[in-house]
Structure formats: structure tokens, C-alpha cells
From Swiss-Prot:
Binding site for a ubiquinone: 201
Location(s), subcellular: Mitochondrion inner membrane
Cofactor note text: Binds 2 heme b groups non-covalently.
Residue positions binding heme b b562: 83, 182
Record-level GO BP terms: mitochondrial electron transport, ubiquinol to cytochrome c
Coarse class of the protein's main subcellular location: mitochondrion
Coiled coil: none
MF (Gene Ontology): metal ion binding; ubiquinol-cytochrome-c reductase activity
Organism: Apomys insignis (Mindanao montane forest mouse)
The name this protein goes by in its record: Cytochrome b
Self-association state and partner proteins as the record states: The cytochrome bc1 complex contains 11 subunits: 3 respiratory subunits (MT-CYB, CYC1 and UQCRFS1), 2 core proteins (UQCRC1 and UQCRC2) and 6 low-molecular weight proteins (UQCRH/QCR6, UQCRB/QCR7, UQCRQ/QCR8, UQCR10/QCR9, UQCR11/QCR10 and a cleavage product of UQCRFS1). This cytochrome bc1 complex then forms a dimer.
Amino acid sequence: MTNIRKTHPLIKIINHSFIDLPAPSNISSWWNFGSLLGLCLIIQIITGLFLAMHYTSDTTTAFSSVTHICRDVNYGWLIRYMHANGASMFFICLFIHIGRGIYYGSYTFMETWNIGVILLFAVMATAFMGYVLPWGQMSFWGATVITNLLSAIPYIGTTLVEWIWGGFSVDKATLTRFFAFHFILPFIIAALVIVHLLFLHETGSNNPTGLDSDADKIPFHPYYTIKDLLGVFLLILFLMTLVLFFPDLLGDPDNYTPANPLNTPPHIKPEWYFLFAYAILRSIPNKLGGVLALILSILILAFMPFLHTSKQRSLMFRPITQVLYWMLVANLLVLTWIGGQPVEHPFVIIGQLASISYFSIILILMPISGIIEDKLLKWSL
């Protein structure tokens, strides 16, 4: 009798995806973050579901309901902080996962990469709307500032913003719809993740060398299930350390003040994982220009496959582009820092220079260095 694992229509799919999947024998720990993102999504959906059982999406009671969750619900404080810090872990894993993809040229899997870019936008939208729900000061003003950016769209801007708000300002209608979207989006993300994996399994995984690994494949289980398990334990350790010892480390103190439309906080800023994009937005004096730069700062990932000029896929044997890559990473850290600073000298000019270098490295310098490296190796025609 053949193993049910290989014959049952449903179990067979799981088998081909997680058990008997042929995987390259040399993929490093940077390949662990895909499974960790899956874990983060599961944690967020489960904790979010339990939070939704006690949360009320009404402007008069939203803030109180979050307080109620933390004070009165059994382990409510744990669920709330796991959800809040789980979002931070999600983005840490996302940034590393994308960084790995750029470094090792995984963007040449066009379908997988494009679904990944869509996933990034979906996760960012979900996180933004989730931040509005506690209805603290930063929730309210963050929602006001970010939704207001759409008013920069010519002709339809103002109407569009009021349509999203469901009124003439961020109010009850806005909070209710944000809660509805925040609840449904993670399930759409889960569906997109399946499509992401579907496309990945059409080609098989990339590996650090960027070379074809068909001649040397090993089964996913037990090798990579065990390897992923180590990542899982480390992620949970890191998350729970954050939750149990420093729950408010990454949050904003302003969000412990209930939303007040009559009192603007001195420094409106988003969560840390949006600061790099926020810095790019602020570095352009023109409103529409800033919005376009903001969108392009993420959308630029979709152009990655077309900006690849080298005959080598990975950066493993490309020292010049390696230097540019790490300059880009440092640049993003600078942008993240600037995004959290007030709009004054010298932060404005630093932000503008960092924004220019961000786009320059990706659009100009990296493609040029790819051509130079090919010439040095006498590979160019």
C-alpha cells in the first residue's frame, strides 16, 4: 500500500510543498525568513482574532476597549502586546526577506517577486489601519496625515479623501471601516502567500551562488524543517522578550493619550517600520511629488528585475555591487532615523541627501556596477 501522504489529494499538496519538496543543499539561514513570515502571519491572525472579540470600533469606546483588554481580559495584555510587537517582528522579517531577495538576485523569479511586492503593500496597508484602531493621539493624527496625502491627487483628491473618511474628517465611519479592512486583509494576505509559494514551487528555490541547483537537491523534510525550527525558536524568544520585558519599546507614548481632534501632537510620526518611507515623503517640498516618491520608494522593488545588468545572478562574487548594497542598507537606516526626527536643520538636508542616494544606488549605481563587473571579468560582449 502506497503512503497516504503521497496519494491523498489534499495531503499530497502539503507533501509536495513542505515534505518531499526538492530544495537546494546550500541555502543559508537567510532563507529561514520565509517560514518565519508565515509564523508571524499565523501569530497575528490568532492574536488579532482574540482582540477582535473584545474590541469595539466606535470612537467613544475604542480607547476604553483596549484598556479593558489589557486590564480585565484574561491574558489580554499578553495578546495585545504580542499583536503589537508581532507586527514589528513581521516587518523585521519582511525587510530581511526582501534584502535577501535583492542580494541573491531572487527577483529574477518574476511572478514570485511581483506577488511579494503586492504582499508588501498589503501588509503595510494592514499595519497602518491596525495602528489607527486603539484611537490614541498618534492613531488619530497618523490616520489624518496619511489619508490626507491622497488629496494631492489632481482633480479627484479632495473628494477621494472625504470618501475614504466617510465624512469631513477622520471620525466614527473611518474607524469602523478601518477595523473592517484590518480584519479582512490578513486573510487576503494568507491567500496571496499561497499564490506566492505556488509560483516559487514552479521554479524551485534560489541559492546563495545564484547558480542552477537541480543537480544537487535534498528533501525539505527533515533538513529544512529542523533548520526552520531553530529560526522559529529564536523568533519566539525575541518576540516574547520584547513582549514581556519591553512591551512599549517600539510604540509611541502619545498613543496612551485618547484621540483629541483639537490637540495636535508636536511630532506626528508613524511606527518605526514606516519611518524610512516617511522620511522620503518629507524630503520633497511639493505635496504630490512627496506622495509619488513615497509610493515609488516601495514600488521600485517591482523594477528590480529590469535593473539587473550583470551576467551573474547573485552578489556573492560581485564585490563592487556588494559595497553598494551595504551602502543602501546603511542609507535605509539613516532614513529610518531621520523619519523619527523633527523637521528642522540639519535633519531636513540629511533626509534629502539620503533620499537622493536611495534612488541613485538602486536606479543608477547598481546597474552600472553590474556592467563594470562584467567588463572586469571580460564577460561583456
